[in-house]
Amino acid sequence: MIGPQTLAFLLIGASILLILVVVIRPSITASREGKVIAFLALFIVPVVAAGVGASEHMERSEQTQFCLSCHIMEPYGRSLYVDDKSYIPAAHFQNHRIPADKACYTCHTDYAMFGTIHAKMEGLHHVYVYWLGTPMNPIRLYLPYNNRECLHCHAGARSFEDSPTHTVMIDDLKSNKISCTTSGCHDTLHNVDGLGQVKFWNPAMTRGEKDAK
């Protein structure tokens, strides 16, 4: 079965061939069939190819490996394997509280009406900065982390709702008066500057120990 990426390349190739036909033989547009070919070459096929390509990019840009393909993100990828439950990203990643293949996207998209589009636009900006600009060092979020992203998954979960601590401050959490990540509760995040002093979880080694037993 032809994948989206292959289909996009095929459509681009078809568009180029049709455009060459029109350029080499402009007289072809004098006929009705020629006008149809020109319309396909200049409008329909490019639009469809762009749509397929954009859709494929949208899907690929959600992948964890896409985010970590930028060298400046490498330590953030390593932090997902820190063997310490207080590291919030690591605890979520290692315990499958978030999809492993969409770990970055799951926590860093905006769960609002146009959140996905906003996240994609930021992703395109990251690609632009990576290739043509100068990434900030250290990197940081554009805006303070919104509790909405945490509550999207945790609100309604028994482990969250049954916690007296959460119950008392739920209104302040929803209004962002108290931050989940910077108010002394869950504030150990990627902490990339401290990766040299921590232990790392090796899932392959863990599986080997289980097999040995």
Summary of predicted features, one role per range:
Residues 1-213:
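Short sequence/structural segments immediately N-terminal
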